[in-house]
Amino acid sequence: MNITGVDFICVPTRDWEKSKDFYGETLGLERSKRWGQMPASEFETGSLTIALMQADAFGIEFRPHSLPIALHVDDVQAAREELEGKGVKFPTDTIDSGVCHMAHFHDPDGNQLMLHSRYAPPGATPAEAAGGAGA
């Protein structure tokens, strides 16, 4: 077997109508397809497809994602301010890890999402990112 990538991730919803509006209008993601008449559709992020699925329509118990899906943006602060202007709440301040900026928030069903921007090369330590030892 040779797995060559991830085709899509599923995000469970309780209210597909509300969620599709959030992902499409609030986040500005392109809706690429609807799954027939099922309460499910796909949104494109540029590198990964997010499939929103109303859990009960597929016989699945609804449980929101407890770990965030990291959505890449060029400027976390600017993206955060844009979303705050649309009513999105952020439970914490923006985090600077030493290699990236992150801002956590939730979709209408409580799934965790994150705005993310890496400013250091992958694999760099915080010291290397800051120009310290080993840089």
Locate the predicted segments by residue:
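Residues that act as N-cap/strand-start positions at coil-to-secondary-structure junctions
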Residues: W35-Q37, H65, S97
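Core segments of cupin and vicinal oxygen chelate
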Residues: C10-I50
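A short local loop/turn or secondary-structure capping micro-motif enriched for an aromatic residue
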Residues: F58-F62, P121-A124
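Generic preference for hydrophobic
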Residues: I50-L52, L115
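Vicinal oxygen chelate
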Residues: M1-N2, G5-R14, S41-E44, I60-A135
